[in-house]
Amino acid sequence: MANIQEKVGLGSGEPSAETGKGKSKIDKHVKHGYHTAKGKSSHPMEDFVFAEFRQVDGNELGLFAIFDGHVSQKVPDYLKANLFNNILDEPDFWNETEKAIRRAYHFTDDTILEKYADLGKGGSTAVTAILINCEKLVVANLGDSRAVLSRNGKAKQLSIDHEPESERKDIEERGGFVTKFPGDVARVDGQLAVARAFGDKSIKKHLSSEPDVMVETIDDDAEFIILASDGIWHVMNNQEAVDCVKEIKDARAAAAALIEEALKRNSGDDISVIVVRFH
């Protein structure tokens, strides 16, 4: 089944959304679906989603990612077009997958900085998940988009929220500083609400582009994974997100339901959700 993309709405008066779905060719039970919704801000949608199954060197890879941009769309759009290709171009991807992903993240960030004249001063978070032959899941992330696995109905976070407060020591050792004003979140150099990101050339020397990488075996206890931008996690915790979608067998409907719930809870940010069901 080919990946299907559509432009839809979440209902009367709701922002327009991008949605899509697809399924594995080697395991008919493994399916993905995604949904997005623009937030309340006046700027264009800055979340970008990548979701597809791809046959590579006789293996099947499920490639899933959410790129949550800031300042402009150019960096997340570049990541959508290039990050997975850069990962798969690493010569030792199959033998040392975690190291290959780390190198590809750094290479991609270096390239973004080199292309500053074209891509501008913006940046992006990222959470990527690579499903290898429906058996092994490798998750990497920069920033605060999140990956959460449901295992026997219990939420397990497979990413790290890279918040300025928790990485204050590293930021200060690089010559930066963290501000925390009343009514606002902590920010690097008074600007960025995450401590790790792609791009952001103006404050790059105070940020990190080193991803956290986690590996998970997909067995009978692993039910589904949620990838979502921070528009979800600002209004619900991991277990609430799992509980919201666990009874919805259609992955695309599950992603849409999670966004609907976030909107009910007054999330004002751009929201993107991918759900991958394993059985």
Which sequence ranges carry the predicted segments?
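PP2C/PPM-type serine/threonine phosphatase catalytic domain
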Residues: 1-279
